């Protein structure tokens, strides 16, 4: 299996599905001739033609609306929103049309579309290029939401998303495109070629949606994470010496609640980490699930480590970003409770 950066794993998944299924089409701002701002579609237009990989105007509502119509008529569109921060003009088409089409038509029509969005901070993108809006999508019935943490998962989950008959939001942490970033911004970037999950098989494979992965087994505390925070949590556990069990959710909807429950019942403690703002973040839903299912097994209050309730600051990016120091402090608190 060749080592592969995460953006190239995304490209490999798109390449595989374009080759296997003539109904797959890929489009968005700069995804055609230019190959995407993060190179995730590099060379695909030259290989498959302008009718299957093409550029669009800067009109997110139009991009998503076109995808809904394509899906209803049998295609499998994979539109890209250049940054997750730009999706807001397209939310009406996404929430009112794509998410509800199956329900509204009695399943006569579906919207088998996968909307790719680079998300998250850590690249000095400021408030308009750093947001993590996953909780917007998990609140809407009819959408599935995925956020991979490594190249191997990115390819397998994206293939599964494209094959799904319902709309999937595929969030790609852009700080992970080049390597497994653990929050230590003052250290040299590690390449995916030095990480076991940077090895990506050639050809077709899929990872079913709704299955979490245990990245680190442990008995002291459960850490629920996804995306970039998987690597931050691993660093925090290593630096504190706490025997943490790290659960990479991978898919936020459908959510692997059985894996969450099994781990928390075992450890009796739970820390939840995400990069998005704290209030009404997805961590609040995870906390509710843990309290409902594992209340009598808990030996300490559930902790959340998140971004702050502010727009993503440019100059104070690393004060906002939940790094291993903040995560490690939360791990110590639940162990001392």
Identify the residue ranges that each predicted region occupies.
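Thiamine diphosphate
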Residues: 1-167, 171-178, ...
